[in-house]
């Protein structure tokens, strides 16, 4: 550990001691609390990404992108939101025809794209192509991917096939509470797997690292460290299955661990590439001792879509 890293250790530990319990509490609570947490992290990560793009001469439409990103995040709570909106208007005697979740998401992305292109007609800064591309990329890569994390939590209980896991074919209050807990435990286990993967990759690389993984992008990362991270991610998900995720089969836990071990480290490399291209070490200094939100959650961005798709279309189908 370098002297600067050692000096920042108390701040890092202090921030982690506050942030980790809050994240766990929001994950277990689900609903609006978890949405608010993810939307906040998503918005700040997107802001940092746009700042990186600006350092390379782009002029992304920050306000448009951040607002669109929030609505994209909101789209992943649409089933819950749809019920609230429909009931609100029904109480006033108004019966609305509602979008499906996919229709709403596509509508939001279509309007967002049209607004970005129209705004560039009136701007005189930079390249319209580069400005539009960076604005759209940020929302698709960050907001959309974070949205799938929200959707993963929303599967419990809204997308949970009770008939598949309970012999009665329906869930009583105790079983519904169990399903809710599974949702929170799934998110917490995913985060734990990512953090343990990162930690194991770092210390494994320091102790045993000899062969560079991707020197042009991240000179300190090694194949040996990546292997330690990969194995640790799988073992963490297997342990989570034994302790709290009883609905997972053995191979499900292994596959989810594989997603973390592969796509989590890939996400870290991709963010490192963006930062190196922009000539900075951290995406920001918003989190004392940790850098920026994009720095801390870069792995989560790329893992979340694969976890959501697998749980929704394989585990719960």
Where are the regions that the model predicts?
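Hydrophobic alpha-helical transmembrane segments of integral membrane proteins
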Residues: 17-18, 284, 301-302
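Juxtamembrane boundary at the C-terminal end of a transmembrane helix
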Residues: 309-317
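Membrane-embedded alpha-helical bundles of polytopic integral membrane proteins
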Residues: 2-256
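Juxtamembrane interface at the ends
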Residues: 201-202, 206-207, 272, 276-280
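Hydrophobic alpha-helical transmembrane segments of membrane transport and translocation systems
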Residues: 301, 305-310
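Interfacial loop-to-transmembrane junctions
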Residues: 277-299
